[in-house]
């Protein structure tokens, strides 16, 4: 935006410091072969309408999430090729993984109604390669499958359960007379520490960090959690497949995000978010030994999310990305700023 350039805001500073060419829409877009739309879902319709007026003939429009196409039903000019490269993590983590010489698993797709030159898949592959995703894994998918699996993962294990479990585990620790500062750090950094084992060896390695007695206890708790939450996970999946979830979310957009902002404000004012800082180091193994409930919650949530998506027709690879593989990257956001950053990204 011209005012962002004039004010030299943070996004302008970030772009300049990383050697990107910076200019306004009217100057850059008419000459671009590929235009990538990374704005929030709520802004997509307006942004895409503006982009189409500026994009040259036979250019390509890229998405990182297919909500605008699938749930809103956006119609794109027929000469424009429409593709998607959807990294399975927040955008901040895409950059961090690239900087360390790796990448994140990514779904790619082509909008078949906008691929008259049959070049969409090649462009999507090149784009995913450019952000390092080929090092972690690139899976060809579809706009519909990406949207439905992405929403299901976010609403359950990736965001819904991590958020709720953080608050409940903290309340339980405080009720048991634990030091609030220690309890806060155990949970805030515990998710990141524990889920790191998922990256290297899945649920099996995570469970193997426990003693035999603790492993049995975590397993039994996870089975109880699965029985309690199974119907709730299925309802989430049904609402997502039917479009009911997206319909309610778009209604909230029209109401200036009132419901979303109310939820954020409630989280901001929880005792977990306001807990004092614990300055001592917690040994890595202690996160496992004192986090048996957290491990049980992770095991139950991952398995329920994966099984529910699989039973709804989502392919196993996509369900895996959205239930287990993305989890450590979401946990990283809690480690940085508790639930605040996870809710913002």
Curated annotation (Swiss-Prot):
Residues annotated as binding Mg(2+) 1: 150, 154
* EC number, UniProt record: 1.1.1.86
Q: How is the cofactor bound?
A: Binds 2 magnesium ions per subunit.
Which residues are in the KARI N-terminal Rossmann domain? 1-141
Q: Name any one GO molecular function.
A: metal ion binding
Q: Which UniProt keywords apply?
A: Amino-acid biosynthesis, Branched-chain amino acid biosynthesis, Magnesium, Metal-binding, NADP, Oxidoreductase, Repeat
What are the required cofactors?
A: Mg(2+)
Pathway(s) this gene product operates in, as recorded in its UniProt entry:
Amino-acid biosynthesis; L-isoleucine biosynthesis; L-isoleucine from 2-oxobutanoate: step 2/4; Amino-acid biosynthesis; L-valine biosynthesis; L-valine from pyruvate: step 2/4
Task: Cite the binding residues for NADP(+).
Answer: 11, 41-43, 91
Positions binding Mg(2+) 2 in this chain are 150, 322, 326
What residues does the KARI C-terminal knotted domain cover?
142-286, 287-345
Cellular component per GO, a single term? cytosol
Q: What InterPro entries does UniProt report for this protein, alphabetically?
A: 6-PGluconate_DH-like_C_sf (IPR008927), 6PGD_dom2 (IPR013328), KARI (IPR013023), KARI_C (IPR000506), KARI_N (IPR013116), KARI_prok (IPR014359), NAD(P)-bd_dom_sf (IPR036291)
The biological process GO terms on file are: isoleucine biosynthetic process; L-valine biosynthetic process
Query: In which family does this protein belong, per the annotation?
Result: Belongs to the ketol-acid reductoisomerase family.
The cross-references to NCBIfam families, in alphabetical order and at most eight, read:
ilvC
The protein depicted here goes by the name Ketol-acid reductoisomerase (NADP(+))
Name the species this protein comes from. Buchnera aphidicola subsp. Uroleucon sonchi
